[in-house]
UniProtKB/Swiss-Prot annotation:
Pfam families: GDC-P (PF02347). Gene3D superfamilies: Aspartate Aminotransferase, domain 1 (3.90.1150.10), Type I PLP-dependent aspartate aminotransferase-like (Major domain) (3.40.640.10). This is Probable glycine dehydrogenase (decarboxylating) subunit 1. Belongs to the GcvP family. N-terminal subunit subfamily. It comes from Nitratidesulfovibrio vulgaris (strain ATCC 29579 / DSM 644 / CCUG 34227 / NCIMB 8303 / VKM B-1760 / Hildenborough) (Desulfovibrio vulgaris). One of its GO terms (molecular function) is glycine dehydrogenase (decarboxylating) activity. It is an enzyme of class 1 (oxidoreductase). Keywords: Oxidoreductase. Its EC number is 1.4.4.2. Transmembrane segments: none annotated. It catalyses: N(6)-[(R)-lipoyl]-L-lysyl-[glycine-cleavage complex H protein] + glycine + H(+) = N(6)-[(R)-S(8)-aminomethyldihydrolipoyl]-L-lysyl-[glycine-cleavage complex H protein] + CO2. The glycine cleavage system is composed of four proteins: P, T, L and H. In this organism, the P 'protein' is a heterodimer of two subunits.
């Protein structure tokens, strides 16, 4: 039967086939008092009226603001070629390539993505992606639980509070012990983290740069964790990885990231991209798709889904994860973006972003009562302590067309006067100067 609106005759045939008299009989298991009496749907509109309605709604959005928001999601420039190439029909509509002989192009693209992120993070293995940075971090934690057969996880409070909320939600019924180690003025408390990692710990979970923008070397912490047979799990910012010490250099066992900053536009929370990488001993624990490269009997290169004993291929209880899909299109966009930039271009993107952040920090801290939250090095994002409420500053400047940053007090009690400011290569020095002048005018 074609997928078109069914005629009364079609409906009658289908109802007869399944042995019911009316469509309402299909919902007999739902009590009558719980069924909607009416959906109160408005009268249908013509195509022209629908367009007018949507245009009127979209006109309410403010597109003329200059935003210094970050907090894990960044407005980097995306070359137009990313949209042009990723919107090709063979990529845009393709699903999981179960038949490798018919999907070599898709499989090769995923393989190249895996290779690119492994090189970027200096790790051994990667999967084809998961949903976003938060789900990637949860899956990393579960990898550690399976690999170590332990249930205690030590989490740095300087880890993104968005991720920490997701972890608490995802693990609420898993009988895991989540130990959160408080930060110190936006910095990781290394002594407290080490003290919390013992022989019952599955993993220590950190972020670099952390939520407050601080850059940290976790090499000693991961060495300490390894001495207790625990794993080191780190969440990173892909663009900054081009200029920072990599997870591999620090000795991390699992490294994850949200790939939004490479090829994905800011879009009300998604779709984004969860990047997952690990060391070779953990490759059988990593969830999702993995594409491998091999040779056929004639010596020709071929790409296939490999190590498939993970989700729908085996019993649910034996699977590494319930994630049966991935963000292959977003992964492709990230691959195209990385390829267009090249190593030098990615480094330049990071350097330009850091350059503007340094200038912004200098201008803002020159204002009376404004000081950096910490003295640790930072990349393209930093936190400042204001003499007034950060919420008030955000409200007043946003009304004038400049979003000055993120009010940290939204997630951290007692930090209502702390503002998190992020810069990318898209910000001009002039815009930074205007921000400083506007902030100075209300302090």
């Amino acid at each position: 039967m074609p997928f078109v609106p069914h005629s009364p005759e079609d409906v009658s045939v289908m109802l007869d086939a399944i042995g019911v008299n009316t469509i309402e009989d299909l919902f007999a298991d739902i009590p009558a008092e719980m069924r909607p009496k009416s959906f109160a749907l408005p009268k249908g509109l013509s195509e022209m009226d629908v367009c007018s309605r949507l245009e009127a709604l979209s006109a309410r959005n403010r597109t003329d603001v200059v935003s210094f928001l970050g907090a894990g999601f960044y407005d980097h420039h995306i070359p137009k070629a990313v949209d042009a190439l990723s919107s090709r029909g063979e990529f845009y509509t393709a699903y999981t390539p179960y038949q490798p002989e018919a999907a070599q192009g898709t499989l090769q693209a995923i393989f190249e993505f895996q290779t690119a992120v492994c090189r970027l993070l200096d790790m051994d293995c990667a999967n084809a992606s998961v949903y976003d940075g938060g789900s990637a971090l949860f899956e990393a934690m579960m990898m550690a639980v399976r690999a170590t057969r332990r249930r205690k996880l030590v989490i740095d409070e300087a880890l993104s509070p968005i991720y920490r909320t997701m972890l608490a939600s995802y693990t609420s019924n898993l009988q895991l012990e989540l130990v959160t180690v408080p930060h110190r003025d936006g910095l990781s408390d290394m002594d407290a983290l080490k003290a919390s990692v013992d022989d019952t710990c599955a993993a220590v979970v950190v972020q670099n740069p952390n939520f407050f923008g601080a850059i940290t070397d976790f090499t000693d912490l991961f060495t300490h964790a390894r001495a207790h047979k625990a794993l080191g799990v780190i969440s990173v910012y892909p663009v900054m990885q081009s200029v920072l010490k990599t997870p591999g250099e620090m000795g991390a066992d699992i490294a994850v990231a949200d790939g939004q900053s490479i090829g994905q536009p800011l879009s009300f929370g998604g779709p984004y991209l969860g990047i997952m990488t690990c060391t070779k001993p953990l490759v059988r624990q990593i969830p999702g798709r993995i594409v491998g490269r091999t040779q056929d009997v004639d010596g020709r290169t071929g790409y296939v889904l490999t190590l498939q004993a993970r989700e729908q291929h085996i019993r649910r209880a034996k699977a590494t994860s319930n994630i049966c899909s991935n963000q292959a299109l977003c992964a492709l966009r990230s691959l195209i973006h990385l390829t267009l930039l090249g190593p030098e271009g990615l480094v330049r993107t990071a350097e330009l972003s850091m350059e503007r952040a340094r200038y912004a920090a200098e201008r803002l801290t020159a204002l009376p009562g404004v000081e950096l939250l910490h003295d640790a090095p930072f990349g393209n994002e930093f936190a400042v302590r204001l003499p007034v409420s950060a919420f008030e500053v955000v409200d007043r400047l946003t009304a004038r067309g400049y979003v000055p940053g993120f009010p940290v007090g939204r997630y951290y009690p007692g930090m209502d006067n702390v503002l998190l400011v992020a810069c990318t290569e898209k910000h001009s020095f002039e815009q930074v100067g205007i921000l400083a002048e506007m902030l100075g005018g209300i302090l």
